[in-house]
Amino acid sequence: MIFAIDLIKSNCKREILKIKKIKINYLFYGNCRYLINMINLKSSTTRILQPLDSVVISHDS
């Protein structure tokens, strides 16, 4: 399964998204716009396709 998420934030904010029981912490800076592609395989991986700003992704299980 492939999930494509287009995230647009105007303020510096911390967002927590739960996708397929995987908690992903997104740390945003300034005017943030990211295209995140998450691919669920045997071991879930997260890929950044188009980072338009700095982003920190941490996996919590």
From Swiss-Prot:
> Superkingdom of the source?
Eukaryota
Q: What is the name attached to this protein's record?
A: Putative uncharacterized protein DDB_G0268290
